[in-house]
Amino acid sequence: MPVVSLAQMMESGVHFGHQTRRWNPKMSPYIYTSRNGVHIIDLVQTAHLMDEAYNYMRSQAEQGKKFLFVGTKRQAAGIIAQEAARCGSHYINQRWLGGMLTNWATIKTRVDRLKDLERREESGALDLLPKKEASMLRRELAKLQKYLGGIKTMRKVPDVVVIVDQRREYNAVQECQKLSIPIVSMLDTNCDPDVVDIPIPANDDAIRSIKLIVGKLADAIYEGRHGQLDVEEEYEDYEGAEDDYEYDETEYTDSVIPDDEEEAE
C-alpha cells in the first residue's frame, strides 16, 4: 500500500506545477502534461518517490540519525515548525543564515548565546538589570529565538536535510552538497532534481500540498523512532496564508542575524 494515495494528492493539489514558461527542463521526466499553460505533475511518480523517501527516512530514524527541516516561505513556515517538533527534529523556517552548516562552529556560538539569554530570562536575572540594558538583551533574545529557535538543541550538523522548495533554499542545498549531507526535497516544476538525493515532485506553493508531503516525512521519522504512529492531527493554523504565493526572486540570506532595519524591509 502506498504511503500516500493518488486521491489524497489530487485533493491536496500536489499535481499543480508552475506556468509552463517557468519550468526547468530537468523536471520533464516528472511532468505528465500541461493544461491552460500550467504543468501537471505525474502523481504516479510522486507516489513512487514518496515511498522511497518514506522508507529512507524511517530507516535513518531507526539508526538514530538527526534531521533538519528547512522551509522559509510563508506557506511552509508553520508546517515545518510543527511537523519537525512532532517528530523530534530540528528546523529552520525564517531565514537561512549563510554558513548555517558549513560554518557551524560560529553559528553554535549564537545558539549558545540564545540558551544563555533564555536561562537569564527564566531565572529573572534580566529583571535585575537597568531597564535599557534589559530591553536590549530581550530584543537580542527575540531575534535569536526567531532565527535559531528551531536548532536550539542541535549539537552538530544534521545527518539528513528535508527541504521545501529547492530553488528558494539554494544556499541550504549548496551547503549540504559541500558537506555531503543527503537531501530529501519537494520539487516543483521550476526546480532542479539533479541537486537533491531523493526528489519528490510536488506543488511546493500550496499549503495543503506541503502539509501532506511534509507530514508524511515526519510520520516516517516518528515511526522509525517509536515503531508506530500517533493519530493524525489536523492543522488549522495555516489556513490564513494564500496558496497562490509566487516565488520571490529577490530573497537573500545573510551570515548574521538580521538587524531591525532589515527586518522592517
Swiss-Prot record:
GO terms for biological process: translation. One of its GO terms (cellular component) is cytosolic small ribosomal subunit. Residues 231-265 are annotated as: Disordered. It comes from the Bacteria. PROSITE patterns: RIBOSOMAL_S2_1. InterPro entries: Ribosomal_uS2, Ribosomal_uS2_bac/mit/plastid, Ribosomal_uS2_CS, Ribosomal_uS2_flav_dom_sf. PANTHER family: 30S RIBOSOMAL PROTEIN S2 PROKARYOTIC AND ORGANELLAR (PTHR12534), SMALL RIBOSOMAL SUBUNIT PROTEIN US2M (PTHR12534:SF0). HAMAP family: Ribosomal_uS2_B. This is Small ribosomal subunit protein uS2. The gene is rpsB.
